[in-house]
Amino acid sequence: MKVKVSYLGYIRVMLGKREEEMELKEGATIGDLLNMLSDKYGEAFRKEVYEPGLQDLKYGYGVIVNGLLMARLQGLKTPLKDGDQVILTTLISGG
């Protein structure tokens, strides 16, 4: 299956691209996608965004699937399906 991954904020600058299409196995989850991205982009990605061993995004990053923040779904265990739109972004907060 294929999902479209868009990058916003600093991650877009770091990776040097706006979006890409990723090929995943049927039944893949957000965690599987992040592991693939970690393998593809290596140390820079792991250091900034996601550490596979920790199984969590680093502080300040979020994943949105089809308009919903993954925290409102099933977190990293959220299943993906063909045609999903995934956004990896820095989170901004204020006070």
Task: Map each language-model feature to its residues.
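Ubiquitin-like/PB1-type beta-grasp interaction modules and other compact soluble beta-rich domains
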Residues: 1-94
